[in-house]
Amino acid sequence: MPELAVQKVVVHPLVLLSVVDHFNRIGKVGNQKRVVGVLLGSWQKKVLDVSNSFAVPFDEDDKDDSVWFLDHDYLENMYGMFKKVNARERIVGWYHTGPKLHKNDIAINELMKRYCPNSVLVIIDVKPKDLGLPTEAYISVEEVHDDGTPTSKTFEHVTSEIGAEEAEEVGVEHLLRDIKDTTVGTLSQRITNQVHGLKGLNSKLLDIRSYLEKVASGKLPINHQIIYQLQDVFNLLPDASLQEFVKAFYLKTNDQMVVVYLASLIRSVVALHNLINNKIANRDAEKKEGQEKEESKKERKDDKEKEKSDAAKKEEKKEKK
């Protein structure tokens, strides 16, 4: 397989925000299932840095994938204006909101190659169902068939990640300040991340199973590169039938369960101590409150007796006069 022109795509938060805004605006006007736009950025060796984007008018027939329209005149005018602002940002590819590849993506990508020979497609999921990266990057390659038929264009997956400069990080933190739940601890976050990771693994395994079933039934041609990579994955799996592996697994599990048990005991003892301390504090507070009430009653009684004695003295003085 030929070496890819790009090995990693870095998408900036500004691009994600622009795409979501584009999707929300178009969704209110019409019922388009996806929106399309152009990606701007720069190349650094084999890393593509996508720092900006703009929307492009796009429409397609829901029934016939071969019928679609992309306004390239609007594209050229918008790119001319963006180039005046920042000449270093060039057209590096295009995006759509998918959430999966479409049959006419190859044809659209061929059109985008007029402006960028190594055009990259980034699918941005604006309504993700699970936590994780909302981006999937692809680049078109020539696929050679084993049966001698002519080569055809297909998409090759490229690693993607979210990256930001310092100013963008400050802006994103400011936007997320009111969304973050400060009551959630690190433990719950770790457990949530592991659960979502297992869900993602399950989804990938189902995709692999579906692919292998289609290849076995003859619905898809054999791609030796994919088969070799799957074989490498299977070779890395541990042999669960080995007695040593089973013993090591049980020992590791028992150690972890002992730690969990001790943590539960310590938590119970601490809670019991807190309960006792709370009861003692409440008892002392009640005693103090009772003493204060008794003292206030005694003071009021003394004041009344003093008032009576003063009144009696005044009466005696009047009688003497």
From Swiss-Prot:
Domain MPN: 9-144
Molecular function (Gene Ontology), one example: metallopeptidase activity
UniProt-listed CDD domains: MPN_RPN7_8
N6-acetyllysine modification, residue list: K204, K214, K313, K314
Segments for region (Disordered): 281-321
Sorted UniProt keywords: Acetylation, Isopeptide bond, Proteasome, Ubl conjugation
Glycyl lysine isopeptide (Lys-Gly) (interchain with G-Cter in ubiquitin), cross-linked positions: K180
Pfam family, one: MitMem_reg
N-terminal signal peptide: none
Keyword Ubl conjugation: yes
GO cellular component entries: proteasome regulatory particle
Similarity-based family: Belongs to the peptidase M67A family.
Task of the protein: Component of the 26S proteasome, a multiprotein complex involved in the ATP-dependent degradation of ubiquitinated proteins. This complex plays a key role in the maintenance of protein homeostasis by removing misfolded or damaged proteins, which could impair cellular functions, and by removing proteins whose functions are no longer required. Therefore, the proteasome participates in numerous cellular processes, including cell cycle progression, apoptosis, or DNA damage repair.
Subunit relationships: Component of the 19S proteasome regulatory particle complex. The 26S proteasome consists of a 20S core particle (CP) and two 19S regulatory subunits (RP). The regulatory particle is made of a lid composed of 9 subunits including PSMD7, a base containing 6 ATPases and few additional components. Within the complex, PSMD7 interacts with subunit PSMD4 through their respective MPN domain. Interacts with TRIM5.
UniProt disease annotation: Disruption of the Mov-34 locus is a recessive embryonic lethal mutation.
Other remarks in the entry: Does not bind a metal ion.
Protein name per UniProt: 26S proteasome non-ATPase regulatory subunit 7
Species of the source: Mus musculus (Mouse)
